[in-house]
């Protein structure tokens, strides 16, 4: 059994920060369970472009409001607590936070923990 608190992660290499987000990574590749689990903050008033071409991501909003836009079609969905979206086709997308949002994110394959987005909004596929 693995038990971690947010305090265990903050300030470690499992706590990554970008310009518009910060990600606290609870479950990682080294845990050998086939997925990773992140507690992610999206800063209020920001827009981020992401493309997880190497990962499938499920995102569940637990705080705040915003929207996600599928880049290829322009479709927009509103996000609020209780809303989930799944990037099951490695969808290129924009994430816009009206207020600070807190999201629970599951990635497959699992993240190593040190990933940050490259110039294309992509997490590289890292090996430990």
From Swiss-Prot:
GO terms for molecular function: ectoine synthase activity. Its EC number is 4.2.1.108. Pathway: Amine and polyamine biosynthesis; ectoine biosynthesis; L-ectoine from L-aspartate 4-semialdehyde: step 3/3. Keywords: Lyase. Disulfide bonds: none annotated. InterPro entries: Ectoine_synth (IPR010462), RmlC-like_jellyroll (IPR014710), RmlC_Cupin_sf (IPR011051). GO terms for biological process: ectoine biosynthetic process. SUPFAM superfamilies: RmlC-like cupins (SSF51182). Gene3D superfamilies: Jelly Rolls. It catalyses: (2S)-4-acetamido-2-aminobutanoate = L-ectoine + H2O. The keyword Lyase applies. PANTHER family: L-ECTOINE SYNTHASE (PTHR39289:SF1), PTHR39289. Belongs to the ectoine synthase family. Catalyzes the circularization of gamma-N-acetyl-alpha,gamma-diaminobutyric acid (ADABA) to ectoine (1,4,5,6-tetrahydro-2-methyl-4-pyrimidine carboxylic acid), which is an excellent osmoprotectant. This is L-ectoine synthase.
């Amino acid at each position: 059994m693995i038990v971690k608190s947010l305090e265990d992660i903050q300030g470690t290499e499992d706590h990554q920060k970008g310009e518009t987000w910060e990600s606290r990574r609870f479950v990682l590749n080294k845990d050998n369970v086939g997925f990773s689990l992140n507690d992610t903050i999206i800063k209020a008033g920001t827009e981020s472009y992401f493309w997880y071409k190497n990962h499938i991501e499920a995102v569940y909003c637990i705080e705040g409001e915003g929207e996600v836009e599928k880049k290829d079609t322009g479709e927009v969905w509103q996000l609020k607590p209780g809303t989930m979206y799944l990037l099951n086709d490695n969808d290129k997308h924009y994430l816009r936070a009206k207020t600070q949002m807190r999201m629970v994110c599951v990635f497959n394959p699992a993240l190593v923990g040190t990933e940050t987005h490259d110039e294309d909004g992509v997490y590289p596929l890292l090996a430990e």
